[in-house]
């Protein structure tokens, strides 16, 4: 909930149109409703594991992009966020696929048969898509921060840019 508060504050700094801000607020409420509805539905069978794997894939995406981008560097990905590189984007995808797959296999070994997750081509594609969406989320928040002329979205996590920066993927 705190990240949505930070997101709405960011929008308030950029846009002055009350109608636009109302529409954004409506979509935040709608998103929260569907997100929590999904959580309730996922609790039926293996929902916690699915949510955990989604969160882990976003974490691996962020870590992979940062580590590979810093180590290899190379051409910039976009002017929206000048520290993002093409090598970082590829590292993000690789870390997501390898890290999340390893975590899911570990989770399956720890809790025998808890999730029937067999690594397949479809899961491979889904992990790539997850990484790409995580990177887009990061770029969108970077764009909004640049437009609002702020470095961090909040101060609850010093050095991390705020809650929104941690979960933007």
Walk through the language-model features, giving the residues of each.
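Interfacial loop-to-transmembrane junctions
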Residues: 146-169
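Membrane-embedded alpha-helical bundles of polytopic integral membrane proteins
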Residues: 1-128, 132
């Amino acid at each position: 909930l705190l990240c949505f508060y930070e997101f709405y504050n960011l929008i308030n700094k950029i846009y002055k149109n009350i109608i636009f801000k109302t529409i954004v607020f409506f979509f935040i409420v709608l998103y929260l409703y569907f997100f929590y509805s999904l959580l309730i539905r996922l609790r039926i069978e293996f929902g916690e594991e699915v949510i955990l794997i989604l969160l882990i894939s976003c974490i691996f995406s962020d870590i992979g992009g940062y580590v590979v981008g810093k180590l290899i560097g190379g051409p910039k990905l976009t002017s929206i966020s000048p520290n993002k590189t093409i090598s970082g984007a590829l590292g993000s995808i690789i870390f997501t696929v390898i890290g999340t797959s390893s975590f899911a296999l570990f989770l399956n070994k720890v809790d025998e048969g808890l999730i029937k997750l067999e690594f397949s081509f479809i899961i491979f594609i889904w992990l790539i898509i997850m990484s790409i969406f995580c990177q887009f989320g990061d770029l969108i928040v970077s764009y909004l921060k640049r437009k609002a002329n702020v470095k961090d979205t909040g101060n609850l996590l010093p050095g991390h840019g705020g809650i929104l920066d941690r979960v933007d993927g």
